[in-house]
Amino acid sequence: MEKIRPKYYITTAIAYTSGKPHIGNTYEIVLADSIARFKRQQGYDVFFQTGTDEHGQKIELKAEEAGITPKEFVDNVSTEIKRIWDLMNTSYDKFIRTTDADHEAQVQKIFKKLYDQGDIYKGYYEGLYCTPCESFFTESQLVDGKCPDCGRPVTPAKEEAYFFKMSKYAPRLIDYINTHPEFIQPVSRKNEMMNNFLLPGLQDLCVSRTSFTWGIPVSFDPKHVTYVWLDALTNYITGIGYDCDGNSSEQFNKLWPADLHLIGKDIIRFHTIYWPIFLMALDLPLPKQVFGHPWLLQGDGKMSKSKGNVIYADDLVDLFGVDAVRYFVLHEMPFENDGVITWELLVERMNSDLANTLGNLVNRTISMSNKYFGGVVTKTGAAEEVDDDLKAVVTATKAKVAAKMEELRVADAMTEIFGLFKRCNKYIDETMPWALAKDEAKKDRLEEVLYNLVESITIGACLLESFMPETTEKILAQLNAEKRSYEELDQFGLYVSGNKVTDQPQILFQRLDIKEVMEKVEVIQVKQKAAMAAASQEEEKEEEAVIDLEPKEEITFEDFGKMQFQVGEIISCEPVKKSKKLLCFQVKVGSQVRQIVSGIKAYYKPEDTIGMKVMVLTNLKPAKLAGMMSEGMLLCAEDAEGNVCLMTPEKAMPAGAEIC
């Protein structure tokens, strides 16, 4: 009789289809995948769901900017997201889209059910709305007058809307959180939700909009579309066959409640306040745990296109490989605090942890086995006391990894596994196989040492599978080792004595030269900037800032007519020595070349300006700046933050063309 396996239902937040996900977004799916794979290895019947969130005002606006329908827009982005999830070797069981017909039908039924039972009522909304976050806020919730979640401006919104009676369920939710300490993790997230939202008192939630149309219509009042979060959150139940009429699927009855909702810390409020209250209203059990993971930051800031610091998964994979990227994002992210990714840190980890600690260990062990015994690995029983310590470390690692994974401390679990590999490297130093090989009388001892190394690496590789699955396969193939069951991973000595390792060991991870990597990174960044510039008309149109200047003294047309403005072409540019601000330009204006000195060194690299068409005041009296003659002025614009950009003609114009 087949053993009944315990179920484990894990979800990620569904990715918002406003654009291509960067590595910070991608971290979540890799983290969830490592947990799902580990649970499968432990014997759980795992169902792992992810997908895309495809409705909302932001998407409607982006589609309009792109000149296509919202459905065409989300089809393109959802396909790209799925491609990246697959590129990262994630083992999801279902990829749901909120534009799926069965999901939309259930959302309409859920809305109607909540309305019929009095949890939703019709009213009038007037307040503040953040379009990127699809969220409403009161004045008191804003931070410096802006959205508390993303920091962008909010806009006044006034429209007829349906509301959900959040306050009706708030006491019940507070009691639930207090009696289920494991529900919101880490604990700091729980404290934030209780102190900032629940205990001060919940306001009723606006759950429909009439100011845009890209959403799921309210079935009995189709001028309203369902609030995107009511739509998106229900994917966790609609994706596994929930039906609010009482005809839910066998799969739903088996899987719900979810064991883990894995989400970013920025959307913890929606998942630990709105979502559980919706479930209470539907008379459904709450998920067992919601884990709000930290952000993966680029350098010292959150990744965003507007900051120009975006790192994409496919660029990382092209440079380092899938498993190296998986290793980095899983190992470098703390349990609670934000992690940091930089190209330099990636190279450092690749060289120290992957190429040296792991890759060199495997390569040395296989090479010594081939050199001394033709690749044959034999257990001789010629043991010494130092072996006991190695075996103790190796056989204890499984339990240590399991304990860390139970707490979702994935980075710590990987540290335990790499601790095993480090212990193997230390064992080589302790036993000195090269010295044993010089003494024929110590042949049996040498064989035992190499057997212990192969066995230890095999166990470590099997434990590594949830995090770096391709690397596990490569190691086991080179060792000619069978994949072990989870139950066997604390047993030492199962490698078949007499097996032969490969006689052609492959380097698992090449050492990288930081200079070469950064040259490739520069190419990537140049391409990104070019792509962003080309797509600038399709990017989200942020509310443009305006700057009011103190008016200067009026001038007459005659005064203005004295100034001559022409188009110039920059043909060379050099920094001015001993100056922190100045660049010296050679600018072609008509048939002449003028030298112009400008204080924009902080905003442009000299090489980036060559070939630019710029606007030049050409009849300004020449003057010396830092000892260099300047024969004109380059026209620039400056924003409120002091950022400066050169003014350039909208269309291609010849050098010397008059600006009038």
Residue ranges of each PLM-predicted region?
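Cys/His-rich short segments
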Residues: 117-170, 174
